[in-house]
Regions:
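Short, compositionally biased strand/turn segments
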Residues: 23-40, 111
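Conserved class I S-adenosyl-L-methionine
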Residues: 57-65
């Protein structure tokens, strides 16, 4: 990732997490080796993104997970801005009558934090 004053400032405030504190949504090839995530888009990212030409495009990625697609789009020439929705607006569960929504929320929040850690882990390369 190229040096940038804003990025450098963010990295100063958010040091690289430990790998064991991460949950990788995407697979990556990093200088330190391969990371296997839940989804491996490495061979088919262009197809996954619909074959859209990204050079000199501006992309808003909402919910980048581990950030594989962010990197891919940047490598294709796009200017990518990633936004992570706040955890206060969780819409991933339907609150059925006997569903322990609070327990689910605690587990989900912990897992999402690990995914967010993976974004920082990968982007500190």
């Amino acid at each position: 990732m190229p040096a940038h004053p804003l990025t450098d400032s963010l990295f100063a405030h958010y040091p690289r997490p430990q790998r064991q504190d991460c949950s990788f949504y995407h697979s990556f090839d990093l200088p330190e080796g391969e990371i296997i995530g839940q989804w491996d888009l490495r061979q088919h990212a262009d197809q996954y993104l619909g074959g859209v030409a990204l050079n000199q495009r501006s992309v808003l990625e909402v919910g980048p997970a581990s950030g594989f697609l962010s990197f891919h789009m940047e490598n294709q020439g796009a200017q990518v801005t990633c936004v992570e929705p706040p955890l206060s607006y969780l819409w991933d569960a339907v609150p059925f009558a006997d569903y322990d929504l609070e327990h689910w929320r605690q587990e989900f929040t912990a897992e999402i934090q690990k995914v967010r850690n993976s974004f920082w882990y990968v982007h500190h390369q």
